[in-house]
Amino acid sequence: MDCGKSTLALQMDHNHRARGRGGVRFSRNDRAGKSRISSRLGLQTDAVEVGDGTDFWEEVMRRRTQGQRVDYLICDEAQFYSPEQVEQLAKVVDEIDVDVFAFGITADFRTRLFPGSQRLIELADRVQVLQVEALCWCGRRATHNARTVDGVMVTEGAQVVVGDVDMAMDPAATVESGHIPVVGYETLCRRHFMRRVTAHGANLMAEQDQLLPFEVDACLWHGTGGTGAGTSAEAGA
């Protein structure tokens, strides 16, 4: 999230169409609604909505039989595809020489690989990390997608809940007293993901710090260092 993958998908589609190639755009669970590819920059276009029963091989063969030119596929939100659908995409590439460009995130809000993303990594000819880096609220490169419910980071719930910075309802959540939990997503660096410190939480702690008669170690939320526990292991930030 926040790394420009849908923007790149739209740009890729534009570049190929500008050279006279014929393609089909696919997406699933886009934040703009069904049958759309949208980016946070405000760009969006129509697409074929991928469902549980979508068979990419049959879809391409049907279109070609009807006389449509299909040279490439743009597959956005590919993390939501099933492993079987990813295998169908590989077959489309290998058997009928159709180029497939898949865009998606690798892991969910629990840091677990999406099944579709895992199969893509296993089968793809090439995996590229997007050059546009998402940023954590602290300014570091964001590497994890956190889910928040009513502003509080959670690590349990349904794997797929469509949302963004807008509200969505978690189907695994219970509704009490007519309250519908507001679900959002935020990109965090590993440090603040592990500490469960979101931008909202950091702001609250900063406000509390201003009310205290003593100074609180800012590293707990500003990411300026650890708390003295040494380790010999290294991890890239």
Locations of regions flagged by a protein language model:
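Short recognition patches in nucleic-acid-associated and regulatory proteins
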Residues: E133-S177
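Conserved P-loop
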Residues: M1-R64, D108-R119, V132, A168-V175, ...
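Residues immediately C-terminal
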Residues: F80-Y81
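Walker B beta-strand of ABC/ABC-like P-loop ATPase nucleotide-binding domains
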Residues: L73-I74
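A short acidic, amphipathic alpha-helical/loop segment
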Residues: M12, E84-V92, G116
